Amino acid sequence: MKVLKHGLLLLTTVVCLASANAQTVNDIVNKHINAMGGKNKMAQLKSIHMDMSMQMMGNDIPSSVTIVEGKGFRSETEMQGQKIIQVITDTGGWSINPMMGGTPQALPAEQAKQAAGQLYATGPLYNYAEKGNKVELEGQEKVGDVNAYKLRVTTRDSSESTYYIDPSTYYIIEIVNSGEMMGTPVTITVTNSDFQKTPEGYVLPHTIQTDMGGQFSITAKVNKIDINPPVDASIFEMPKQ
């Protein structure tokens, strides 16, 4: 009987600890969503367009991003008078790079799958369960001077990223994930700063620095944000060769 009682006590303790951890994760996620504008605002975000300037290796590069929530992502970057385009959709992806031939190329299925998170302007934490994402709290960890919450996010396709949330603002200040550069695995670190509220009430970072495994970094400055602009779905269709 003692063994049974001890077993039940241990099981109850484990269940309670798991429940407490789940509540803590949801509490952090909810506070993050509130900090970015709130659930109602997020539910109303159907599309977004951002004009940016990127600094890379001393060059100022114009770029833009258009997202239709859950449907399509398109980025355009102008380099040396030529436009590089990358598109991700809910069914795949494609790109055009004039420096590598200039013809539309379908993205490998695995690459398109790993980039599918870019389809969501609301991010992976809003309605994460409905998106098929799993979020786990892994304690706190220093990011600069901030003792940030560390959340591991696993998407439905098993891609993993680590999100660091500032406990004083509940903004995502850093994202770490794995990627490839020239066929070599690298750790990609994205640092968000200069958070500003749009006239519509959304709080978004206006400076985004991406470090490619220490090889080089790109700093994007957001110049303009359009919330819920009309978007022609044809911009996500791969041109015929």
Where is each model-derived feature located?
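Short amphipathic beta-strand/extended segments with alternating polar/hydrophobic composition
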Residues: P62-V68, I85-D90, P104-A112, I165, ...
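Bacterial Sec-dependent N-terminal signal peptides
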Residues: M1-V25
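N-terminal mature ectodomain segment of secretory-pathway/periplasmic proteins
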Residues: N26-G101, E136-L137
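Gly/Pro-enriched, hydrophobic low-complexity segments
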Residues: N147-E237
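Flexible, processing/modification-adjacent segments and terminal tails
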Residues: N21-N34, K41, S95-S159, G179-V186, ...
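Residue-level detector of beta-strand face positions
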Residues: H49-S53, E76, W94, Q140, ...
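Structural motif
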Residues: M56, M79, V143-G144, P199
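Extracytoplasmic
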Residues: L45-S47, G70, E130-G132, V146-A148, ...
